[in-house]
Amino acid sequence: MAYQEPNKDGFYGKFGGRFVPETLMTAVLELEKAYRESQADPSFQEELNQLLRQYVGRETPLYYAKNLTQHIGGAKIYLKREDLNHTGAHKINNALGQVWLAKRMGKKKIIAETGAGQHGVATATAAALFNMECTIYMGEEDVKRQALNVFRMELLGAKVEAVTDGSRVLKDAVNAALRSWVANIDDTHYILGSALGPHPFPEIVRDFQSVIGREAKQQYRDLTGRDLPDALVACVGGGSNAIGLFHPFVEDESVAMYGTEAAGLGVDTEHHAATLTKGRPGVLHGSLMDVLQDAHGQILEAFSISAGLDYPGIGPEHSHYHDIKRASYVPVTDEEALEGFQLLSRVEGIIPALESSHAIAFAVKLAKELGPEKSMIVCLSGRGDKDVVQVKDRLEADAAKKGEAHA
């Protein structure tokens, strides 16, 4: 299949587009023009590649998780180690690319939204590197959950604005950042952290994150002597690490692609962020995509143990993959993610982010189904340092509840 998305209007099949007020249209058109110019300029990519090598530490390893594979007794599991990037997650791939683009556009200030804080830290890091002013918008609820990342951002010279609107999480931070961009368009670039928002953001983020899949494809060949893995697994919130892994394989039809959504307390409760499992198409933050909404089209609150996955929408390209059945999207509960978190830590000595733990949990199930002749690549999108205290508290609370139940 020849995959040519997006079209000139920013649509991936029937999803995507540019649903923004007139005040923002100038900015997104300016951004698209600058991005097309950078794509045509070899020096832009050369400079970015050099930074990715020398500053970020790419390429990241593709690691055969032998212990985990043997423990499960199924398909071979290879981990794409995005947790080993500078700042501890895949987010830096996009942040660095966009700050470099903004610098070339002559912008002076950077703004961004963040949920778990990883995109905020990555953006603040890139802004420090390029000596640019930086403000990060973060839902008040996430500020509490991720105090360590808030301090990191401030340490890197960024100003962190706690957003008190709505449910005080990621979608509210995006709203606040977009409002700020409208008011400061001339000298400010807004760095969206995931593969969503109005065109050209989903395409830009995908392109900067596709380094994950391009490296993994070549590394898999070098490691195994085989052409392609049988499956890919990555967690999806907005979906940037997943689209980065999936996109370079999209025309390889023999490769099954699985995105793991946050099922929270279960998809039959109101407490989840399983957008493709339970949502339907709607416009959010400038793009037509699958969205969690009620019968009246009001956006529902998303819920997940992982701050990076509780977004009520998903990038339009994922909605398109789902629509054309190129990828499958499966719900993984908080409890399953916690099991994945502990299992990888115990068996491989790698503490994954709670986001990535959703992918690990599903990979364990999939490995059993596929059997030992098959193999898969799992995107380990980030490291779990930021989540250790939260997991400790949660496991202690669960143990106390069990103790009370047995008393």
UniProtKB/Swiss-Prot annotation:
<dbReference type="GO" id="GO:0004834">
    <property type="term" value="F:tryptophan synthase activity"/>
</dbReference>
<keyword id="KW-0822">Tryptophan biosynthesis</keyword>
<keyword id="KW-0057">Aromatic amino acid biosynthesis</keyword>
<dbReference type="InterPro" id="IPR023026">
    <property type="entry name" value="Trp_synth_beta/beta-like"/>
</dbReference>
<keyword id="KW-0663">Pyridoxal phosphate</keyword>
<dbReference type="GO" id="GO:0005737">
    <property type="term" value="C:cytoplasm"/>
</dbReference>
<dbReference type="InterPro" id="IPR001926">
    <property type="entry name" value="TrpB-like_PALP"/>
</dbReference>
<dbReference type="InterPro" id="IPR006653">
    <property type="entry name" value="Trp_synth_b_CS"/>
</dbReference>
<protein>
    <recommendedName>
        <fullName>Tryptophan synthase beta chain</fullName>
        <ecNumber>4.2.1.20</ecNumber>
    </recommendedName>
</protein>
<comment type="function">
    <text>The beta subunit is responsible for the synthesis of L-tryptophan from indole and L-serine.</text>
</comment>
<feature type="modified residue" description="N6-(pyridoxal phosphate)lysine">
    <location>
        <position position="91"/>
    </location>
</feature>
<dbReference type="InterPro" id="IPR006654">
    <property type="entry name" value="Trp_synth_beta"/>
</dbReference>
<dbReference type="Pfam" id="PF00291">
    <property type="entry name" value="PALP"/>
</dbReference>
<comment type="subunit">
    <text>Tetramer of two alpha and two beta chains.</text>
</comment>
<comment type="pathway">
    <text>Amino-acid biosynthesis; L-tryptophan biosynthesis; L-tryptophan from chorismate: step 5/5.</text>
</comment>
<keyword id="KW-0028">Amino-acid biosynthesis</keyword>
<dbReference type="InterPro" id="IPR036052">
    <property type="entry name" value="TrpB-like_PALP_sf"/>
</dbReference>
<keyword id="KW-0456">Lyase</keyword>
<comment type="similarity">
    <text>Belongs to the TrpB family.</text>
</comment>
